[in-house]
């Protein structure tokens, strides 16, 4: 059996129990946002940008979702430069401005360490606009490193709702002994699991109330394009990335 798989399954199970109340709070905020005609923004910097990709324009995902990201913050475009750019608060504020975050929206910001200027600024800028901010980060990692944001705040400090992934310090799950780098990161898996738990909760509440959950269908399945036209008509005027 795989050590990574065993430990990942343990972390997922622990997260679901330990963070149940915080996840429920995030679900409640997202439901209120959808009911008021607002948007659910999600993203981060570096590999946490995967949250933007997973949540946005995704078969089975929310049509009310809007991505928070930036080319300068995404490693595939310029890896070494992105490491420096994610430390810059200006980049974080610019990402929120591009997304068009508004009062009443719910904003999910992911960051393994929660120390860099851009994600912390994303949270602060969103809160200034009246949005509810949900931080997805690792307390284990954050506790061992100093914030790089000018305020001295970690991402957790700038959020209304905090969800701790439980990912290990340094992200890598498997140790190899003294003098060797640990390997097999797990933060992306845990972050996407958090998003999926929130998505599940949102749809269940809307369904139970007899309301329509705005969900995309696969464009690679019969009828998908036709279904999605309805979602586009409703959300393209507001979601800038559409």
Features from the language model and the residues they span:
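Flexible, glycine/charged-enriched surface loops at secondary-structure junctions
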Residues: 21-26, 40, 207-216
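Glycine-rich phosphate-binding loops that contact phosphosugars or nucleotide phosphates
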Residues: 35, 41-200
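Internal, active-site/partner-interface "lid" segment
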Residues: 171-175, 204-229
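Generic N-terminal amphipathic, Lys/Arg-enriched alpha-helix
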Residues: 1-18
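Ligand-binding pocket scaffold of soluble enzyme catalytic domains
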Residues: 11, 39, 53-54, 179-182, ...
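A short N-terminal beta->alpha junction/helix N-cap motif
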Residues: 13-21, 39-43, 122
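A short, well-structured juxtamembrane/interface segment
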Residues: 18-35
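Long, charge-rich low-complexity segments
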Residues: 237-242
């Amino acid at each position: 059996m795989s050590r990574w798989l065993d430990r990942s399954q343990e972390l997922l199970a622990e997260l679901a129990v330990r963070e149940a109340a915080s996840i429920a709070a995030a679900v409640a905020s997202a439901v209120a946002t959808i009911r008021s005609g607002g948007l659910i923004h999600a993203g981060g910097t570096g590999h946490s940008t995967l949250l933007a990709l997973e949540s946005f324009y995704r078969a089975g995902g929310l049509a009310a979702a809007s991505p928070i990201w930036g080319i300068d913050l995404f490693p595939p475009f310029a890896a070494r430069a992105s490491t420096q750019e994610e430390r810059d608060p200006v980049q974080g504020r610019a990402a929120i401005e591009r997304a068009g975050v508004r009062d009443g929206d719910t904003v999910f910001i992911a960051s393994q360490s929660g120390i860099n200027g851009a994600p912390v600024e994303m949270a602060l800028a969103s809160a200034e606009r009246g949005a509810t901010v949900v931080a997805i980060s690792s307390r284990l990692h954050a506790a061992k490193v100093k914030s790089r944001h000018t305020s001295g705040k970690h991402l957790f400090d700038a959020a209304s709702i905090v969800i701790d992934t439980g990912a290990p310090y340094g992200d890598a799950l498997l140790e190899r002994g003294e003098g060797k780098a640990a390997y097999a990161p797990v933060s992306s898996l845990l972050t996407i699991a958090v998003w999926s738990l929130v998505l599940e909760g949102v749809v269940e509440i809307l369904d139970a109330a007899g309301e329509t959950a705005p969900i995309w269908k696969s464009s690679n399945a019969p009828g998908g394009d036709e279904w999605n036209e309805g979602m586009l008509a409703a959300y393209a005027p507001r979601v800038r990335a559409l």
